[in-house]
Amino acid sequence: GLRLPVNFDSPYRSLSVTEFWKRWHMTLTAFLRECVYFPLGGSRRGQGRTYLNILVVYLISGIWHGAGWTFIVWGLLHGAAQVTERLWGGRRDALPKWLRWVMTFFFLNLAWVFFRAPDISAAAALLKTAVTGGFGGIRPWLVNGLFRREFSALELLAPAVRPYTTYLRVALILGAGLLTALWPRNTVRQMEVFRPTVRSCLTTALLAAWSILSFTGVVTFIYSNF
């Protein structure tokens, strides 16, 4: 009988960082808005104070995720991005939607580097390598768990693809990720129109069985650390 609040609503479809935070971790955003942003004065005390309040809110958001400099930088980056969007105003809205999406997606992934890096030095080294090159190819640990059984079967059926399976795995996971994030209805929207049928039950059972058979290990839920 409990109705849980929606927490994510296809955040990677966002056309701005401001919109991203209306779709990403919505319960945390609501908490910070009600308990930090509004008590600080919100947007009622002038433009400069509004910008400062935004920076404080996202600084706290970073610290909430972890007491480290990487999380602080991540939070301040998101705060600074939203201040910049406010300063830019309607001029940004006049840009084509595809360009606004690319800008937002690029920024989000840049900020995630700091979120996931063990320290600032590691984040800086990764960003430097991304600009200058020198990654040295795809690391095996990155793809070893992706579609392992499926590609083993593919290599048996078509040995000629064996030299390219690593690149095919990366292309498949990136393509599937983008497709899942950008194209179909998310689970929340899907449940609004979902009607159980024999076909949907069989499809769900097949996908569930495929997922179970594809297990390669246990991954700790990332938010267990927060």
Language-model regions, residue ranges each:
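Acidic, glycine-rich loop-and-beta core segments that form the ion-binding/anion-interacting portion
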Residues: 1-7, 11
